[in-house]
Amino acid sequence: MRVIPDIEYGEAGGQRLLLDACLPPSRKSSTSNAPDPAPRASIIMIHGGSWTRGDKADPEYRDVCTWLAKAGYPTFNVDYRMDPAFIFPAALEDVKSAVTWLRQPEQLGRFNLDPARIAALGGSAGGNLASLLGTTGSGPVTEGTRVSAVVDLSGPADLTGADAKPGFIPVQLAFLGCASEVDCPAARAASPIFAVSADDPPFFIANSTNELIPIEQSRRFADALRAAGVPTTFVSVTGGLHSVAMLGPSLRARILDFYASTVGVNSASPAPGAG
C-alpha cells in the first residue's frame, strides 16, 4: 500500500484543490506476463471538521484512507474549500469536481479505475457532503458527478435546524452564509434529506446514540431514502463516538460488506469484512 499526497484535482476561488491517493499494493510485477487486472472500484473520501477546519492528512482520516486501500479499494481523500472564506455550495462543488476529475480518461488509466464504480465515504461535515454527492449527483454514472454507493458517518442530513443541537446551529449557519434559520434558503439545498429520489445510490448510514448529530436526524434521512425505494442500511452505534471515531472492527467489517455488495470486491482484494 502506498500514499501519493497532494495531487491537484482542480482550482477554484484562487485555491488549489488537492487530494491524497491511498493505493492498494500492486497486483502485477513489472516482469509479469499476466494480463492487466480489471479496472477497480474506488472511493472518494471526505473529511469532517464542521466545514471550517480539518485536512485530508489528519491522522484519523489518513488511517481510514489506508484501511480502505489495504482492503483493495483505491481511495482518494479530498480537501475542499471551507468557511468562512467559502460558503455553501463551494465545498459541494469541489467534491463533485473530484468525482469528475477521477473519471477523466487520464486518471482512469493512471489508477486503473472503473468509472461506473466510484463510491463515497464521509464523516461529520464530510458525511453531509458525501450524502449530497449521493442525492444531487448528475449525469451518466460513467461521466458525471454521480457515485454508486455512499457511506455516511454522523453526517448532518437536515440543516434547517429542525432537530439540531443548539450549539451546532451557529456552525451550520456559518457554512450556509446565513444570519439566522428564519431566512436561509441555502439550508434546504445543503440538506440531503430534501433531495432524496428513487435513483439515488445505495446508502450506509451510521450514527451514535448520544453524539453531536442527533440520531433521530440520521434515522429520518434513512427513512426518507427507504421510502423512495433506495437500498439503505442504518446502523445505530451505542455511545457518544462521532464520525470516524465510531469505526471499530465490527462497523469496519459491515462497511466493507456494503461496498462488496454495491460496487464489488476488486480482484485480489481481501474478503469482505477483512481489515
Label the model's feature ranges:
Residues M1-G275:
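Alpha/beta-hydrolase superfamily serine-hydrolase fold, recognizing
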